[in-house]
UniProtKB/Swiss-Prot annotation:
Record note on quaternary structure: Homodimer.
Species whose genome carries this gene: Escherichia coli
UniProt domain DHFR: residue ranges: 2-174
GO biological process: dihydrofolate metabolic process; folic acid metabolic process; one-carbon metabolic process; response to antibiotic; response to methotrexate; tetrahydrofolate biosynthetic process
Record function comment: Key enzyme in folate metabolism. Catalyzes an essential reaction for de novo glycine and purine synthesis, and for DNA precursor synthesis.
InterPro entries, per database record: DHFR, DHFR-like_dom_sf, DHFR_CS, DHFR_dom
Pathway(s) of this molecule: Cofactor biosynthesis; tetrahydrofolate biosynthesis; 5,6,7,8-tetrahydrofolate from 7,8-dihydrofolate: step 1/1
Keywords recorded for this protein, A-Z: Antibiotic resistance, Methotrexate resistance, NADP, One-carbon metabolism, Oxidoreductase, Plasmid, Trimethoprim resistance
EC code(s) of this entry: 1.5.1.3
Protein name stated in the entry: Dihydrofolate reductase type A10
Catalyzed reaction equations: (6S)-5,6,7,8-tetrahydrofolate + NADP(+) = 7,8-dihydrofolate + NADPH + H(+)
Length: 187
């Protein structure tokens, strides 16, 4: 099973969301990367992330929502599968050959990082401060920097001084020997 995390956050504060939306303006290059990376894959998210998705093209992706409270009525017209827990999703998809991309929220990212072989993290630096009510937890960042190889920068856009924003997308790869190994064994 090939599991990746793909998420964006503000570089300095680690802001992740604000009132169910991204805390920064739309960044074309980041959205293009996200769409290309998640195409023809299984996209896993929590309920709030599902509700926050724009009405974008959802073709070429299998959507999974992890929620113990969502109802079938809420998603009747959408092409998604619902699982009560990330563990039940893993069990059901254990033999899949499709790439799996976990996109949020932060609780699900924190749980899924234990199973991930790759993390794509977009770090956005805004010249003006952003407002947020959800942040990437320090524990998730610590896990990322302790269990994964030093990142490879795969995209850089903008200038942090002369632009409204700069964007850096980094790819972290976990050494194969640590994929799926609980954190207490890694130390």
């Amino acid at each position: 099973m090939n599991i990746s995390l793909i998420f964006a956050n503000e570089l300095i504060t680690r802001a992740f969301g604000n009132q169910g939306k991204l805390p920064w303006q739309f960044i074309k290059e980041d959205m293009q990367f996200f769409q290309k990376t998640t195409e023809n894959s299984v996209v896993v998210m929590g309920l709030n992330t599902w509700r926050s998705l724009p009405k974008m093209k959802k073709l070429g992706r299998d959507f999974i929502v992890i929620s113990s409270t969502i109802t079938e009525h809420e998603v009747l017209n959408n092409n998604i599968q619902i699982f009560k827990s990330f563990e039940s999703f893993l069990e059901a998809f254990r033999d899949t050959t499709k790439p799996i991309n976990v996109i949020g929220g932060v609780g699900l990212l924190s749980e899924a990082i234990e199973h991930a072989s790759t993390v794509y993290m977009s770090s956005i630096h805004m010249v003006k401060p952003v407002h947020a009510d959800v942040y990437v937890p320090v524990e998730l960042m610590n896990k990322l920097y302790s269990d994964f190889k030093y990142p490879e920068n795969i995209l850089w856009v903008g200038d942090p001084i002369d632009s409204v924003y700069s964007l850096s997308i980094d790819k972290f790869v976990r050494p194969a020997s640590l994929v799926g190994v609980p954190n207490d064994i890694n130390t």
